[in-house]
Amino acid sequence: MMAIISSQNSPPERSRPPSVLSNQPTPEEQHSLAEDSLRPHSLQDYIGQQELKEVLHIAIQAAKARQEPLDHLLLYGPPGLGKTTIALILAAEMGVNCKVTSAPALERPRDIVGLLVNLQAGDILFIDEIHRLSRMTEELLYPAMEDFYLDLTVGKQQTARPRRLKLNRFTLVGATTRAGALTSPLRDRFGLVQRLRFYHPEELQQIVQRGAALLQTPITPEAALEIGRRSRGTPRIALRLLKRVRDYAAVKHDGRITLDVARAALELLHVDPAGLDGSDRRLLRVMIESYQGGPVGIETLAAATGEDVQTIEEVYEPYLLQMGYLQRTPRGRVATPRAWQHLGYTAPENQLPGLSSPYDTLS
């Protein structure tokens, strides 16, 4: 595939600031040294995702034994589960550099070309939201991933000439929340495809305790578990809540995070014991009060709540589905009896059977 390198600017996208329970990183978290300090830097320190860790450990040891770069890796799952962290850990374990970018930042061919030609042998290129790559950028990646070269067209019109650039062997780590949105040619070029799952409260408890130790904040095991239970199965949210509870403990108490302190701080943040915030409860309440629990079409639900469809599908729905508060049907979304009960309503008999939480057996 030949790509013409040209210059074309587009206005940046505008986005709403995430809430305390958003699984998207805030701008401060994206550039925070404190956030980096809380990341694990080795597979041994990485908590949870045991099957994934075993697969990656084998891949790392095999690549080192053959003195080859790692195979290309696709990570998929809800936001905030540690995809970027895994890419950085792989680079540390392999002793190479890791370049981090995202698909929206690679709109023009020269953007991806500039990254690829500057990679050293064995380096890792991490592309977040890889399902959003433009068609031209994606097609540039095909020969780069398979044969480590780029076919370019340099110049314009009569002065245009083809040029093939050889690349150093590298590892592409792609991350996506929508694996089904990837084209088959791109997905098939990844040698490893791994799914990240939501974390159990006990795993999040360990993450919170580790984070508190790094932040030099005393915390009881019960308080760490309480924060973990309200973190929507997501480490990013658990660490964000830890920081807010730490602030509360420092201002309102003696700096120690006990169970009572954690509960008081989380109530102040409107995070309920199930990990739902005001936006989640509003979404479910609209379905119950305005549409008798559903089914409700996603477009209708977005209009009624003032949220866009993508936010509902990628931010709210994964956790509500996982915890059994929401059900997708061919006719639309349905609030389950579990959601009715959580909000203090009595579900009608014709509603879907109640769904249990995957964490019920763990509490």
From Swiss-Prot:
Entry keyword annotation includes Nucleotide-binding: yes
CDD domains: AAA
Enzyme class: hydrolase
Biased composition (Basic and acidic residues): 28-37
Protein's name in the database: Holliday junction branch migration complex subunit RuvB
Subunit record text: Homohexamer. Forms an RuvA(8)-RuvB(12)-Holliday junction (HJ) complex. HJ DNA is sandwiched between 2 RuvA tetramers; dsDNA enters through RuvA and exits via RuvB. An RuvB hexamer assembles on each DNA strand where it exits the tetramer. Each RuvB hexamer is contacted by two RuvA subunits (via domain III) on 2 adjacent RuvB subunits; this complex drives branch migration. In the full resolvosome a probable DNA-RuvA(4)-RuvB(12)-RuvC(2) complex forms which resolves the HJ.
Function noted in UniProt: The RuvA-RuvB-RuvC complex processes Holliday junction (HJ) DNA during genetic recombination and DNA repair, while the RuvA-RuvB complex plays an important role in the rescue of blocked DNA replication forks via replication fork reversal (RFR). RuvA specifically binds to HJ cruciform DNA, conferring on it an open structure. The RuvB hexamer acts as an ATP-dependent pump, pulling dsDNA into and through the RuvAB complex. RuvB forms 2 homohexamers on either side of HJ DNA bound by 1 or 2 RuvA tetramers; 4 subunits per hexamer contact DNA at a time.
Native source species: Thermosynechococcus vestitus (strain NIES-2133 / IAM M-273 / BP-1)
Gene: ruvB
The organism's place on the tree of life at top rank: Bacteria
NCBIfam families found in the cross-reference section: PRK00080.1, ruvB
